[in-house]
């Protein structure tokens, strides 16, 4: 049945569902960064515009026979499962939204210093941890599913390697983020969890070709980027509630740019061009407007 004419003919709907999950994932990235200071209708509108316009256009550039898909053949732009096409674009839109909306009321004092941490602490660390584990489990579907086939032994072997590299990259992100925060004075569990996401995002651009050790290193750098990216946003007085921008935008850029290190068919210049073009397009469509009444 897998290779039958009926299966091939009707696979459009499977791909539609698969891409719909990618689009929904990107929209949730935006929600995390702008939480607590945007009206529900405003967010529904921006999510609709993103899912209906931004993601289909950006996705088609690489996966739908568009401009960047020709670069794949001629110059070598690769994004296997969406480090840039899904995560960086969502993170770029989230960054624009967080800047336009400004910080939550009381997040920073008049001197620009952080307010008391108590009102802004994570509500439940166990629930945050559970959520990250659910994401980690779902990532096997995202990365493994992007192989788009399981009908041959080669496909099955490829998917199994993708699973292993996805697991190792997430673990690398956790451990690296934990080590960095520990060296700074205290192990930060939330940063470790975000580091896991950063590691997973980083490996998503090319989860098939890296060796297991390379996957760990790619994920580890992604986790470190999350820690220092969070500090950078803090220094810039940008209030990203859940750390979506470092975990998705910054780590996604890293994961896309490092692809040529493990994929000889990729080209750094084209990877950089793709990252810049796609993220600029995503930011240009993020026209959020809010004021203090958005808290009401």
Language-model regions, residue ranges each:
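Conserved small/polar residues in nucleotide/adenosyl-binding loops
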Residues: 1-10, 286-293
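Metal/cofactor- and membrane transport-associated sequence elements
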Residues: 4-5, 9-98, 102-108, 122, ...
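Transmembrane alpha-helical segments of multi-pass membrane transport proteins and ion-pumping complexes
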Residues: 24-32, 51-60, 91-99, 103, ...
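Cytoplasmic-side transmembrane-helix entry/capping segments in multi-pass membrane proteins
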Residues: 42-47, 188-196
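Cytosolic juxtamembrane amphipathic/interface segments immediately preceding
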Residues: 111-122
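Helix-coil boundary and interhelical linker segments in multi-pass alpha-helical membrane proteins
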Residues: 152-153, 204-213
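Structural signal for the N-terminal portions of transmembrane helices
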Residues: 158, 162, 266-283
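C-terminal membrane-solvent junction of multi-pass transporters and transport-like membrane proteins
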Residues: 188-193, 237-257
